[in-house]
């Protein structure tokens, strides 16, 4: 049987305002109005929240990087670290007028010294890909490791990949499975679920378990992953389960 397992090197870029932030942004009209008023009155958390609203296009608002940057800068001026991290992500993201790899590197490097998990993860990505720095898997691994232990979901997935591929560390499928599972438990990471499903299907780093493989593939399929859905049907036909 051919199992269409896709091995992803890195997860989709995740904005700090989503899964990595300590600030939860509610998107009701009343909350948005409250954020706007408090932001204008100088509240750094409200300013950060307004930045997230425009960065992600919440509550029917269109994505507006100009407004997002405006509010993140206001919050950052008052020491709001998550706002600084989001500015770093905007600088890192390709294809906008704000793209500036040097500023992204400076921002993430500064915040990483304060154990900001988002900055550590993105700095790890820069070293893994050789973006703005000399490519270095060892540094990437160490940065992902720090961020993963601090609870960053993307870093947990990325650390799993480093163990899976033996990059910056000896290949270790058991540790890869551990960190993929962390990303699934903490954030229902569909990419991690699909890779771990393949590991259970093959018995690689974990005890072979077809039912567990199907269960994990379903997590990815529920998020719209057509390949995962197809694999479920293939496995069920092969095993008659």
Which ranges hold each PLM region?
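C-terminal motif of bacterial Sec signal peptides marking the signal peptidase cleavage site
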Residues: 15-17
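Structural signature of tandem alpha-helical TPR/SEL1-like repeats
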Residues: 25-33, 61-71, 97-107, 134-143, ...
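Canonical positions in the second alpha-helix
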Residues: 36-38, 74-75, 108-111, 146-147, ...
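Short helix-capping/linker turns of helical repeat alpha-solenoids
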Residues: 40-43, 56-58, 77-81, 93-95, ...
């Amino acid at each position: 049987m051919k199992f269409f397992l896709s091995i992803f090197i890195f997860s989709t870029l995740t904005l700090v305002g989503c899964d990595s932030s300590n600030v939860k942004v509610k998107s009701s009209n009343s909350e948005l109005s409250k954020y706007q008023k408090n932001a204008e009155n100088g509240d750094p958390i409200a300013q950060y929240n307004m930045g997230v609203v425009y960065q992600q296009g919440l509550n029917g608002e269109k994505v507006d990087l100009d407004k997002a940057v405006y509010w993140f800068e206001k919050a950052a001026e008052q020491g709001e670290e998550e706002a600084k991290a989001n500015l770093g992500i905007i600088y890192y993201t390709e294809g906008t007028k704000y793209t500036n790899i040097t500023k992204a590197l400076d921002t993430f490097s500064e915040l990483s010294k304060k154990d900001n998990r988002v900055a550590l993860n993105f700095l790890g990505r820069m070293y893994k890909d050789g973006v703005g720095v000399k490519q270095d898997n060892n540094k990437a691994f160490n940065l992902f490791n720090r961020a993963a232990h601090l609870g960053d979901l993307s870093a947990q997935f990325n650390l799993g990949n480093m163990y899976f591929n033996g990059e910056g560390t000896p290949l270790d499928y058991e540790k890869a499975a551990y960190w993929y599972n962390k990303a699934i438990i903490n954030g229902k990471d569909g990419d991690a679920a699909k890779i771990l499903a393949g590991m259970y299907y093959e018995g690689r780093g974990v005890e072979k378990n077809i039912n567990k493989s199907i269960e994990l593939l379903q997590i990815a399929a529920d998020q719209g992953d057509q390949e995962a859905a197809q694999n479920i049907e293939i496995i069920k036909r092969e095993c008659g389960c």
